[in-house]
């Protein structure tokens, strides 16, 4: 008689914004030299990993979330399994992803899902992979994945995957607005490459439009997203949304990562709610969330064992 599995593992996968994203150069290896400040948010997806079923399976409430090997969750599972010295097929497991973080938005939803899958599947499969090895697996999957294993406010350099924890930023309410189209990371960096190669000079000159509205603090006055100008050149609506957040009281507003989502930081929840209500409508979706400290991120993304 086959023994029925007694428990599953559930974990939240928070989103992020990039408070600053400087693209400094194209590296000899083809990647980009970056200097970015990641900031974790309370908005999150939820992953539930259940043993059993027919092979390794991904299911989601969002049809835009791939269910095959192209999903970073699948790649994370394979790397974890191999890192544990295992061979052959992945264990029969169903990973259910409840998506709340939109895709192709610059909010790191897929990368956060992968980071959470590494932790959840290590627990479910009971594989002997250390925290240090898990971090290395995260870096191999991408800078955003490595960040989500840390959380809070973090500086990323080189490819964005060499991480240095920073003092947590002043807590803020965050309004996220996504237009009814996405921007792929590959496209955003490709557009930056075109401009950089055409100038054959430092990219700093193209960054003047990256800063849309600075806060009253000196630190935030230096926040710039170098991907914003080339993306806005193709999608001017993104800049209009950034400017609208500023008009509605955001102390800082910008595109997050490679877009297409934009964010605004607010001190007061009521002000943030009013801005969200005014910007949500036909062709846009808006969310209200908040920044999280490193401790809050780890509490939010802790592993939970549930009976099945």
Report residues per predicted region.
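Solvent-exposed alpha-helices and their adjacent loops that cap or buttress functional pockets
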Residues: 2-3, 40, 139-140, 146-149, ...
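Solvent-exposed beta-strand sheet faces enriched in polar/charged residues
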Residues: 20, 50, 59-61, 96-98, ...
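Short, basic/glycine-rich phosphate-binding loops at helix/coil junctions
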Residues: 54-66, 117, 139, 213-224
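Glycine/serine-rich anion-binding loops at beta->alpha junctions
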Residues: 96-125, 143, 251-266
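Contiguous, small/hydrophobic- and glycine-enriched helical/loop subdomains that border
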Residues: 114, 118-158
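Conserved, helical-rich catalytic subdomain that frames metal- and/or nucleotide-binding sites
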Residues: 148-150, 155-252, 267-308
């Amino acid at each position: 008689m086959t023994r029925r599995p007694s428990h599953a593992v559930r974990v939240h996968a928070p989103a992020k914004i990039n408070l600053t994203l400087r693209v400094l150069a194209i590296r000899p290896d083809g990647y980009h030299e970056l200097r970015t400040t990641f900031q974790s948010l309370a908005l999150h997806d939820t992953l539930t990993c259940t043993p059993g079923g027919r092979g390794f399976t991904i299911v989601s409430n969002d049809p835009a979330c791939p269910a095959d090997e192209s999903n970073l969750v699948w790649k994370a599972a394979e790397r974890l399994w191999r890192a544990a010295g295992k061979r052959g097929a992945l264990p029969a497991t169903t990973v259910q992803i409840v998506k709340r973080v939109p895709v192709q938005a610059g909010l790191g939803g897929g990368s956060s899902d992968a980071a959470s899958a590494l932790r959840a599947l290590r627990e479910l499969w009971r594989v002997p992979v250390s925290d240090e090895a898990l971090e290395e697996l995260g870096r191999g999957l991408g800078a955003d994945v490595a960040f989500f294993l840390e959380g809070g406010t973090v500086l990323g350099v080189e490819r964005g995957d060499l991480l240095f924890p920073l003092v947590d930023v002043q807590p803020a309410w965050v309004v996220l607005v996504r237009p009814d189209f996405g921007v792929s990371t590959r496209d955003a960096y490709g557009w930056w490459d075109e401009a950089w190669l055409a100038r054959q000079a430092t990219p700093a000159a193209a960054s003047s439009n990256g800063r849309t509205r600075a806060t009253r603090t000196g630190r935030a006055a230096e926040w710039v997203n170098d991907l914003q100008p080339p993306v806005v050149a193709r999608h001017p609506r993104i800049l209009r949304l950034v400017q609208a957040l500023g008009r509605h009281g955001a102390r800082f507003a910008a595109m997050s990562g490679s877009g297409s989502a934009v964010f605004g930081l607010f001190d007061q929840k009521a002000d943030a709610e009013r801005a969200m209500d005014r910007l949500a409508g036909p062709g846009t979706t808006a969310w209200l969330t908040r920044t999280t400290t490193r401790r809050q991120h780890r509490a939010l993304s802790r592993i939970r064992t549930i009976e099945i």
